[in-house]
C-alpha cells in the first residue's frame, strides 16, 4: 500500500471539510462553534428558567400583602390576640396530661397497683386537671362568637371582590348592561367591626375571672408522689404564672389595635421568609411561611450527608488507593448503577420496606439507648435521609475519586520513599492533597439531595411543622415536609395566578437559588483545587 493511499482521508470526512471551506470555516472553527453554541444554549436555558420563576412568582408579595391587609381589616387579627390565650392554655393542659401519664406509670410499675387502683389514686389529680381545663370555657366560647363575626366580615369582603371581578369581565366582553346589573355590596369596615370592638369590656371581665379561677385551682393542687414529679409540677406552676402574667399584654394589644393601620411591603416579605406556618385553604386565614419547609429540607439533607459522606468518600479512597483492578471493575459499576434507579422506585422501597424495617429495629430493647428509639412514625426524617443518602453516594463517590486521581503521583512516591506506610500516605498525604475536591464532591452531593422530590414526598412524612429540636438527636425520628415536596403535592390543586400558585413558585425560586449557590461554591472550590494542584 502506498503512503498516499494510507494517509488518504475517508470520503465522507473529505466532503465535510470541503463544505466547511465553502462556508469559510476551518475544522477547528466548527468545533469551537459547536461546543460554544452548546454553552450558549445552556446560558439561555438558565436565563429562561430564572425569568420564568421570577415572572410567575413576582406577584406573590403584593397578593400576600393584600392577604394580610384583609386579615387585619376584617378583625381576624383582633380575634387571634385572644385565641393565643386559649392555645397557650391548651398547651398547659397537654403538660398536665403528660404529668398524669408519668404518675400512672409510677403507680403501675413502682407501686405495682392494678389499673383500677392506680386510677383511683389519681382521682384527686384528675379533679384538679378537670377544673383547670374547664376554667378556659367562658373565654373559649367568647372566641367562638368572635370568630363567627370576623369570618362573616371576611366573607362579605371576598364576595364583593368576586362581584367586582365579574363586573370587570362582563365590561371587557362588551356586556355593559349585564355588568351594570351586577350588584356589589361594599363592606364598611368601621360599621362591621363595631360589634367586635364592643366586646372589649366583656373580655376584660372574662379575663379577670379566668385569672382568679387558675390561681384558685393551683392552690388546691394535690402533691405529686415522687420528688422528680414534684419538680415537673413546680415547673407547671411557673408556666401558669407566666401565662397569667401575659394577660395585660393581650389587653394592651386589643386596646391599641387599629384596623386602618397599613401593612408594609416588608411585612409581606418577612411573613414568607420567617413565617412558621404554611396553611392553605383555611376558612380562617391562609399563611405562607417557608421556614418549616426549609428546615424540613435541611434536616433531611443533613441526615443524608451524614450517611452518604463516609460511604461515598470511603469507597472512593478504597477503590482509588487500595482495591485491586478486579475489585475496581466490580465496585465502580455497582455504585454508579445506583444513580440509574428511578427515585420513585426508591420512594416505594422506603414506604414498603425501609420505613417499616427501621421502625421494627427501633423497637428492639437492645437499641433503647439510641435517641428517639423506639418510635412509631415509619415515614420521617431518618427514612427519607437514608434513601437520599443512597442517591448521593454515586455523586460523592465519582467526584471524590476524580479528586484523588488528580493528586500527583510524585506525592505518593515521595511518601513511600520516606518510609511511610500505605495508610499513613493515604491519611496524611493523599486525602489532604485532594481535600478541596472532596469538599466540592460533598457540596454537589448536597445539591443533588436538596433538589430531590419523589423520595421526600413519599417518605418524609409530610407534616408541615418545625421539628421539636428540644428532643435532641431524637428529632430525626419526626416527620417533616420539604420545599420540593410541597411544590409537587400542591401545584396540581392551585388556581393559576392565585396567591397559592405564586407562593409555590416563590418556593421554587428559593430552591433554585439555593441549588445555584451550592453549585457555585462547589465549582469555586474545584477551581481553587485545580489551581493549587497545577
Q: Regions from the language model: what does each represent?
A:
Residues 1-34, 54-286:
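Membrane-topology segments of multi-pass transport proteins
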Residues 21-29, 241, 264-288, 347-390, ...:
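Membrane-interfacial helix termini and adjacent extracytoplasmic/periplasmic loops
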Residues 28, 32, 311-350, 399, ...:
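Cytoplasmic-entry segments and transmembrane alpha-helices of multi-pass inner-membrane transporters
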Residues 41, 290-316:
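Transmembrane alpha-helix signature in integral membrane proteins
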Residues 337, 399-401, 407, 422-460:
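Transmembrane alpha-helices
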Residues 458-512:
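Interhelical loop and adjacent transmembrane-helix boundary motif
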Residues 523-534:
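Short cytosolic juxtamembrane segments of multi-pass membrane proteins
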